[in-house]
From Swiss-Prot:
This is Mediator of RNA polymerase II transcription subunit 31. The keyword Methyltransferase does not apply. PANTHER family: MEDIATOR OF RNA POLYMERASE II TRANSCRIPTION SUBUNIT 31. Residues 110-135 are annotated as: Disordered. Belongs to the Mediator complex subunit 31 family.
Amino acid sequence: MEESLPKRWEIELEFVQSLANIQYLNHLAQNNYLSNPEFLNYIEYLNYWKEPEYSKYLVYPNCLHILTLLQNEEFRKNILIPDFMNTVMNDMVKRWQDQDSVFGVTPQSQLEGLNASNGDDTNQPSVEVNGSGSN
């Protein structure tokens, strides 16, 4: 059985989500994609991913924020600056951490869930935050 080629929306989904990778954005800027009018038209076209019927497929929703930022020429120029790129990356990581905290998913709660799933089974080690386990 032959594998079918990916559909256009699958390719666009993958590309839109790749925009959440700040180092990839820097690569695009270094190779002058972010100053190419055709590429910028494509970026503008991809705004349809902000619609709920499409955005529900996104695993990395921060890519939509980046898609918006890419509409700004100053952002496209600044992403070449290492300090700016690092600040954007750090801000994005903080957003992910804050979002996890809002939804109750923290490293501590994940570990507590693992320990609870172990129950009273003494053959299973428990998982502790400091990295040590017990039998």
